[in-house]
Amino acid sequence: MSQSRVLALVVCAAPPVLRIAELIDLLQEDGWTVCLTATPTAATWIDREALAAQTGYPVRVEWRKPGEPEPHPPATAVAVVPATFNVINKWAQGINDTLALGILNEALGAGIPVHAFPNVKEQLTAHPSYDRHLRSLQDAAVAVTPLPAELDWHTAVHRLRFA
């Protein structure tokens, strides 16, 4: 019997998030249970109800209150797709001001695979903090794979298959 694979999928506000349902379909076909958390801005770009119906779990944006049950099962892997300039820089610095960043920060100490799939404008990749923060995340065992310009979700699914 194979072990259940649960992916905590964090989504950020970059154009690929508009097609995140396609990635979720592919991940589910590959045997993943997908639990979605969105940054506050990404939450305004996506259809949270449709994605909750697709995954079977609520799309989380806000922290739960003390005593409230955890709405998602424990993750066996975490991925941030698309990972934006803002989230990469905040995450690398340990900033924990949103649920999405909280999940990413906790994942670094959880002993599970963590993947980042950046989608960042070329001008922003030239910013001096970007490379430094990507290296910092890689040093913390985050697997970094830039999203291809043609947005082939199979790249992400392939990388996560071995998580």
Residue ranges of predicted features:
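A cross-family phosphate/adenosyl-ligand binding-site feature
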Residues: 1-163
